[in-house]
Amino acid sequence: MFPKINTIDPYISLRLFEVKPKYVGYSSVDARNQSFAIHDIKNYEKFSNAGLFYTSPTEITCYCCGMKFCNWLYEKHPLQVHAFWSRNCGFMRATLGIIGLKKMIDSYNDYYNNEVFVKHKNRVYTHKRLEDMGFSKPFMQFILANAFIPPYRKYIHKIILNDRYFTFKFAAHLLSFHKVNLDNQTTYCMTCGIEPIKKDENFCNACKTLNYKHYKTLNFSVKL
């Protein structure tokens, strides 16, 4: 969960004691709960308790300081994130107090830095393992672009462990959900990355034999 850059107020530190909410209609927890409930969002209490209400599928907003956050759906610690990015929000100061707010910011700062470091390290390792497996550059780009989405992040360690069978299986699973519109594009074999292929295929004729045994073993219904 990250704030939208254009909603960060650089002068907010000059208004430390201003607590008038920007969205008075969402001042109560019930009102914020309702904003999530009508859109069938699960486990929304943690967001409403952090002073946030539903704006759109890609965005939630603080009723007090007005800061907007994106990529929020899988966030486990919205209160900490809100405190970290909007430390002078009147709601956060009233809820946590100055000392509690400072402790939470320091705690999340360590977590945030570690998370960024681990993500970068995982990407580097994953790229190297895919390269060692002999996958083409377009294939590696496809995996790296999609594998770090929250629902799939848990599978990364299997790729890092050089599990070629799993990588093919995982890629086929991703392909079924992330099929790109290739009407005006030339697409290439996902193994060699050299030979052009038809828009509804994944491998060239030379690589089909190499890849068929993997898909046959995994009982996959992927068109070669």
Curated annotation (Swiss-Prot):
Where is the protein found, in the record's own terms? Host cytoplasm; Virion
Q: Which domain of life is it from?
A: Viruses
The Swiss-Prot or TrEMBL record annotates one GO molecular function as: metal ion binding
**Short name of one Pfam family for this protein?**
BIR
ATP-binding recorded as keyword? no
Instruction: Answer yes or no on keyword Lipoprotein.
Output: no
Can you tell me which residues bind Zn(2+)? 62, 65, 82, 89
Q: What induces it?
A: Expressed in the late phase of the viral replicative cycle.
- Which UniProt keywords are listed? Activation of host NF-kappa-B by virus, Host cytoplasm, Host-virus interaction, Inhibition of host caspases by virus, Late protein, Metal-binding, Modulation of host cell apoptosis by virus, Virion, Zinc
Query: Which ranges does the UniProt record give for the BIR repeats?
Result: 29-92
One annotated Gene Ontology cellular component of this protein: host cell cytoplasm
Function noted in UniProt: Prevents apoptosis of host cell by inhibiting caspase-3/CASP3 activation to promote the viral replication. Also induces the activation of host NF-kappaB.
Q: What is this protein called?
A: Inhibitor of apoptosis protein
